[in-house]
A protein has these predicted regions:
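Short, conserved catalytic/metal-binding motifs centered on acidic residues
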Residues: 72, 120-131, 160, 211-219, ...
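A short, flexible helix-boundary coil/loop motif
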Residues: 2-36, 40-49, 253-301, 359-367, ...
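Electropositive, glycine- and tryptophan-enriched low-complexity nucleic-acid-binding patches
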Residues: 91, 147-210, 324-326
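Short amphipathic alpha-helical "interface-anchor" segments enriched in bulky aromatics
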Residues: 334-368
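An anionic, glycine-rich sequence signature occurring as long contiguous blocks
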Residues: 173, 237-241, 246-346
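Active-site-proximal, Lys/Arg-enriched surface segment
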Residues: 95-171, 176-179
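Domain-level cores of phosphate- or acyl-group-handling catalytic modules
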Residues: 185-250
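Short, positively charged, Gly/Tyr-enriched micro-motifs
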Residues: 25, 37-108, 213, 387, ...
Length: 421
């Protein structure tokens, strides 16, 4: 007898409900899943696809350990026996790896939904290394991770994160493929920039406002990357290499007329202009930190004179007598440096959120050679991550417990949105 996931509802899910009740589990995340899935799965034309997506999201949140399709299927069919779990696994595998549904509209709908919870402060682009031991995962291989400065074996992905006053969650992804695979001529930098611009294009088409991008990828703010953001008319703040060559444009400042200088030297020459900037510690709610910050207008050398333009180089010192620890450039040259430094701290919020919850929703757990399958998995894992962020209180979610539909608790809107560019 062929047992589908939906056919196990009446018997199996009563067992899951009883087990959940015995464990004293609450369901705020489950309520968030129901409302969020109803909002973001509208592009799935068939009802069974929408139901399968909802079950997959619940399974990601409920399954213990690695969030493999097999583990999710076993969680969904607890008590149904080996036959029911095997049928569920086959059905889920087809839904993720062999189906034809498009993940991009779901990502766009997720961005739109999140924008309704609180004003978007900034997009943050960060790399995500995915260790993989075997050869059976798309894009896996021996790689150098510039963000961490070390070799590893696995996949390299780039995530684009939505950040507001109360929500930090990923909405877009791109996988950097090895040479023998599709898009083999795409560099690490090109992949990172394309990842965020693709996400922003989808968000814009869904009505999202243009907000700055924080490129939290080591040494990413090259001339080519900055030009791509300028062409897309997206304001950007990006990390820059201390050795990157820049031209000082202010005749009153040291280094003017001296040709190109290393970014670190430009900042060291103006360290007398440093000012203290206070910022909230994203890892310690209520705590505040102070850094020394200096900013100077510079030009990124470009062989095409028409594309030469001023950007603002700013650096952050954690200790007065040492070199700057963070170097950034931005095209928002009229924005106050303190506001820019505080904006870069959203990247710390993303790092903290990624470290705490990426494993909980299985963003790194897809195994298989299917690139569309990888995209579908990380898209649904992003929905699961968003549900955890939006729930009134984090709590385990049972894979199949029916929940009552009720309005989500929505974070309060951020009182002050960064103004000016």
């Amino acid at each position: 007898m062929n047992t589908s996931i939906s056919s196990t509802n009446s018997g199996t899910y009563r067992g899951v409900r009883a087990a959940a009740g015995a464990a004293g589990r609450r369901e705020p995340v489950g309520e968030a899943v129901e409302e969020l899935c109803a909002a973001v799965f509208t592009s799935l034309r068939r009802r069974d696809q929408r139901e399968r997506g909802r079950q997959y999201v619940r399974g990601l949140l409920a399954a213990q350990g690695r969030k493999s399709i097999r583990n999710i299927a076993q969680q969904l069919t607890a008590g149904a026996g080996a036959g029911g779990a095997a049928a569920a696994e086959q059905s889920l595998h087809h839904f993720i790896a062999a189906s034809t549904w498009d993940w991009q509209p779901i990502r766009a709908a997720l961005s739109q939904y999140l924008g309704g919870t609180a004003p978007l402060n900034a997009w943050v682009a960060q790399p995500m290394a995915i260790p993989k031991g075997g050869e059976h995962s798309v894009g896996a291989g021996h790689r150098f991770d510039p963000h961490r400065g070390q070799m590893f074996r696995g996949q390299q992905a780039f995530g684009t994160w939505f950040t507001s006053a109360g929500v930090v969650t990923p909405v877009g992804w791109r996988l950097h493929l090895r040479e023998e695979q599709e898009a083999a001529d795409e560099s690490y930098e090109e992949c990172a920039v394309t990842a965020v611009l693709d996400t922003l294009r989808e968000a814009r088409e869904s009505g999202a406002a243009t907000r700055p991008v924080v490129l939290d990828v080591r040494d990413i703010a090259t001339r080519a990357a900055l030009n791509r953001f300028a062409e897309a008319r997206v304001p950007v703040v990006g990390r820059i290499s201390p050795e990157a060559r820049l031209l000082v444009t202010d005749p009153r400042l040291p280094g003017f007329g001296a040709g190109t200088l290393a970014a670190r030297d430009v900042l060291q020459n103006v360290r007398g202009l440093r000012m203290p900037v206070e910022w909230p510690d994203p890892e310690l709610p209520g705590a505040r930190r102070t850094s020394l910050v200096a900013a100077v207008r510079v030009m990124v050398p470009d062989p095409a004179p028409g594309r030469r333009r001023e950007v603002l180089l700013f650096g952050e010192w954690e200790a007065a007598r040492r070199l700057p620890t963070q170097l950034w450039v931005t095209d928002m040259v009229r924005t106050e440096p303190g506001a820019l430094v505080r904006m870069t701290k959203t990247a710390h919020r993303v790092s903290a959120a990624a470290g705490a919850s990426v494993q909980d929703v299985g963003l790194r757990d897809f195994s298989g050679r299917s690139l569309p399958g990888w995209h579908r998995h990380v898209t649904l894992a992003s929905v699961a991550h968003a549900a955890r962020c939006l729930a009134p209180a984090a709590a385990p979610v049972a894979a199949s417990v029916p929940v009552r539909h009720s309005p989500l608790h929505r974070p309060r809107a951020h009182a002050a949105v960064l103004a000016g560019r």
